[in-house]
Protein backbone atom coordinates (compact mmCIF):
# COMPACT_ATOMS: atom_id res chain seq x y z
CA UNK A 1 0.00 0.00 0.00
CA UNK A 2 2.85 2.35 0.87
CA UNK A 3 4.53 1.64 -2.47
CA UNK A 4 1.30 2.47 -4.32
CA UNK A 5 1.02 5.83 -2.49
CA UNK A 6 4.68 6.63 -3.20
CA UNK A 7 4.25 5.65 -6.85
CA UNK A 8 1.11 7.77 -7.14
CA UNK A 9 2.87 10.80 -5.61
CA UNK A 10 5.82 10.42 -7.99
CA UNK A 11 3.51 10.14 -11.02
CA UNK A 12 1.51 13.17 -9.83
CA UNK A 13 4.70 15.22 -9.39
CA UNK A 14 5.99 14.23 -12.82
CA UNK A 15 2.65 15.15 -14.40
CA UNK A 16 2.74 18.52 -12.62
CA UNK A 17 6.29 19.21 -13.78
CA UNK A 18 5.43 18.23 -17.35
CA UNK A 19 2.42 20.54 -17.34
CA UNK A 20 4.42 23.46 -15.93
CA UNK A 21 7.43 23.10 -18.20
CA UNK A 22 6.83 23.92 -21.81
CA UNK A 23 9.39 24.10 -24.57
CA UNK A 24 7.60 27.15 -25.89
CA UNK A 25 7.65 29.93 -23.36
CA UNK A 26 4.17 31.33 -22.93
CA UNK A 27 3.85 35.01 -23.73
CA UNK A 28 2.65 37.08 -20.82
CA UNK A 29 0.82 40.34 -21.36
CA UNK A 30 2.36 43.08 -19.22
CA UNK A 31 0.47 46.29 -20.00
CA UNK A 32 2.14 49.65 -19.67
CA UNK A 33 0.61 51.27 -16.60
CA UNK A 34 0.17 54.87 -15.52
CA UNK A 35 -1.73 56.73 -12.83
CA UNK A 36 -4.00 58.24 -15.50
CA UNK A 37 -5.18 55.91 -18.27
CA UNK A 38 -7.15 57.18 -21.27
CA UNK A 39 -8.05 54.14 -23.34
CA UNK A 40 -11.83 54.34 -23.71
CA UNK A 41 -12.98 54.01 -27.32
CA UNK A 42 -16.48 55.08 -28.36
CA UNK A 43 -17.86 53.56 -31.56
CA UNK A 44 -20.75 54.60 -33.76
CA UNK A 45 -21.82 52.10 -36.44
CA UNK A 46 -23.52 53.58 -39.51
CA UNK A 47 -25.19 51.70 -42.36
CA UNK A 48 -25.47 54.10 -45.27
CA UNK A 49 -26.76 57.25 -43.58
CA UNK A 50 -28.50 55.56 -40.62
CA UNK A 51 -26.83 54.94 -37.27
CA UNK A 52 -27.41 51.40 -36.02
CA UNK A 53 -28.71 50.93 -32.49
CA UNK A 54 -25.87 50.00 -30.09
CA UNK A 55 -28.35 48.17 -27.85
CA UNK A 56 -29.56 46.06 -30.78
CA UNK A 57 -25.99 45.30 -31.95
CA UNK A 58 -25.10 43.99 -28.48
CA UNK A 59 -28.40 42.18 -27.94
CA UNK A 60 -28.09 40.40 -31.28
CA UNK A 61 -24.42 39.57 -30.55
CA UNK A 62 -23.21 41.12 -33.80
CA UNK A 63 -20.62 43.46 -32.25
CA UNK A 64 -17.58 42.36 -30.26
CA UNK A 65 -14.01 43.43 -29.60
CA UNK A 66 -10.97 41.19 -29.08
CA UNK A 67 -7.74 42.53 -27.57
CA UNK A 68 -4.81 41.02 -29.46
CA UNK A 69 -2.23 41.84 -26.75
CA UNK A 70 -4.33 40.54 -23.84
CA UNK A 71 -5.72 37.68 -25.94
CA UNK A 72 -9.17 38.36 -24.43
CA UNK A 73 -12.59 39.52 -25.45
CA UNK A 74 -13.00 43.08 -24.24
CA UNK A 75 -16.23 44.10 -22.47
CA UNK A 76 -18.46 46.35 -24.57
CA UNK A 77 -21.26 48.51 -23.20
CA UNK A 78 -23.63 51.22 -24.38
CA UNK A 79 -22.64 54.78 -23.41
CA UNK A 80 -24.06 58.20 -24.21
CA UNK A 81 -22.03 60.94 -25.90
CA UNK A 82 -23.70 64.30 -26.48
CA UNK A 83 -27.16 62.74 -26.16
CA UNK A 84 -26.44 59.92 -28.62
CA UNK A 85 -26.01 56.23 -27.75
CA UNK A 86 -22.68 54.73 -28.81
CA UNK A 87 -20.76 51.54 -28.09
CA UNK A 88 -17.90 51.78 -25.63
CA UNK A 89 -14.90 49.61 -24.74
CA UNK A 90 -11.48 50.02 -23.15
CA UNK A 91 -8.76 49.14 -25.65
CA UNK A 92 -5.78 47.08 -24.58
CA UNK A 93 -2.86 49.09 -23.32
CA UNK A 94 0.44 48.49 -25.11
CA UNK A 95 2.54 45.65 -23.78
CA UNK A 96 5.69 47.00 -22.11
CA UNK A 97 7.76 45.33 -24.82
CA UNK A 98 5.92 47.41 -27.44
CA UNK A 99 6.76 50.73 -25.77
CA UNK A 100 9.60 53.01 -26.89
CA UNK A 101 10.57 55.05 -23.79
CA UNK A 102 13.08 57.85 -23.33
CA UNK A 103 14.02 60.39 -20.64
CA UNK A 104 13.78 64.16 -21.01
CA UNK A 105 14.32 67.10 -18.67
CA UNK A 106 10.55 67.15 -18.09
CA UNK A 107 10.38 63.44 -17.24
CA UNK A 108 9.90 60.17 -19.05
CA UNK A 109 8.15 60.02 -22.43
CA UNK A 110 7.11 57.17 -24.65
CA UNK A 111 5.09 55.80 -27.51
CA UNK A 112 3.58 52.40 -28.13
CA UNK A 113 0.70 50.56 -29.71
CA UNK A 114 -1.82 47.80 -29.12
CA UNK A 115 -3.95 45.92 -31.62
CA UNK A 116 -7.64 45.05 -31.43
CA UNK A 117 -10.08 43.33 -33.72
CA UNK A 118 -13.66 44.55 -33.90
CA UNK A 119 -16.21 42.16 -35.32
CA UNK A 120 -19.41 43.79 -36.52
CA UNK A 121 -22.09 41.93 -38.46
CA UNK A 122 -19.56 39.26 -39.43
CA UNK A 123 -16.90 41.68 -40.71
CA UNK A 124 -13.51 41.69 -38.96
CA UNK A 125 -11.88 45.10 -38.58
CA UNK A 126 -8.25 45.09 -37.40
CA UNK A 127 -7.21 48.33 -35.70
CA UNK A 128 -3.89 49.44 -34.25
CA UNK A 129 -4.21 51.99 -31.44
CA UNK A 130 -1.24 54.31 -30.84
CA UNK A 131 -0.55 55.66 -27.36
CA UNK A 132 1.59 58.42 -25.85
CA UNK A 133 3.10 58.07 -22.38
CA UNK A 134 4.38 60.84 -20.14
CA UNK A 135 5.58 60.88 -16.55
CA UNK A 136 6.90 63.64 -14.35
CA UNK A 137 10.40 63.22 -12.93
CA UNK A 138 10.28 60.74 -10.05
CA UNK A 139 6.60 59.95 -10.80
CA UNK A 140 7.08 56.45 -9.39
CA UNK A 141 7.48 58.02 -5.95
CA UNK A 142 4.22 59.99 -6.24
CA UNK A 143 0.61 58.96 -6.28
CA UNK A 144 0.14 60.11 -9.80
CA UNK A 145 2.21 62.01 -12.26
CA UNK A 146 2.03 59.63 -15.23
CA UNK A 147 -0.40 59.33 -18.13
CA UNK A 148 -0.91 56.94 -21.02
CA UNK A 149 -3.43 58.10 -23.60
CA UNK A 150 -4.77 57.07 -27.00
CA UNK A 151 -3.56 59.37 -29.76
CA UNK A 152 -4.40 57.92 -33.17
CA UNK A 153 -5.31 54.63 -34.80
CA UNK A 154 -4.32 52.83 -37.94
CA UNK A 155 -6.66 50.94 -40.25
CA UNK A 156 -5.50 49.30 -43.48
CA UNK A 157 -2.25 51.27 -43.41
CA UNK A 158 -3.91 54.66 -42.95
CA UNK A 159 -3.60 56.81 -39.84
CA UNK A 160 -6.91 58.09 -38.53
CA UNK A 161 -7.23 61.00 -36.11
CA UNK A 162 -10.47 60.28 -34.28
CA UNK A 163 -12.92 62.67 -32.73
CA UNK A 164 -11.61 63.63 -29.29
CA UNK A 165 -13.69 65.51 -26.76
CA UNK A 166 -14.09 65.35 -23.00
CA UNK A 167 -11.34 62.73 -22.88
CA UNK A 168 -13.30 60.53 -25.32
CA UNK A 169 -11.82 58.86 -28.38
CA UNK A 170 -14.65 58.29 -30.89
CA UNK A 171 -14.55 56.42 -34.17
CA UNK A 172 -17.23 55.76 -36.77
CA UNK A 173 -17.55 52.41 -38.55
CA UNK A 174 -19.42 53.07 -41.79
CA UNK A 175 -20.83 50.12 -43.75
CA UNK A 176 -20.28 50.35 -47.49
CA UNK A 177 -20.98 47.82 -50.27
CA UNK A 178 -17.29 46.77 -49.98
CA UNK A 179 -17.33 46.31 -46.17
CA UNK A 180 -16.57 48.89 -43.50
CA UNK A 181 -14.60 52.11 -43.46
CA UNK A 182 -13.20 53.67 -40.28
CA UNK A 183 -13.49 57.40 -39.66
Residue spans of the language-model regions?
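Bacterial N-terminal signal peptides that target proteins for export
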Residues: 1-8
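C-terminal motif of bacterial Sec signal peptides marking the signal peptidase cleavage site
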Residues: 16-19
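Extracytoplasmic cysteine-anchoring/structural motifs
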Residues: 21-37, 70-183
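Exposed beta-strand and adjacent loop surfaces of beta-rich binding modules
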Residues: 40, 60-62, 115
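A short, amphipathic beta-strand motif
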Residues: 41-45
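Short, ordered, surface-exposed loop/turn motifs in non-cytosolic proteins
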Residues: 50-83
Amino acid sequence: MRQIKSGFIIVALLALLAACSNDEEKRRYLPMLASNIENEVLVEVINGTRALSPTTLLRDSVFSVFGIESEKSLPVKVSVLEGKEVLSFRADLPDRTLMDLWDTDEGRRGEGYADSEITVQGAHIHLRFYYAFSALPRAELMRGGSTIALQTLEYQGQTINPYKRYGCFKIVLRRTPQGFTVE
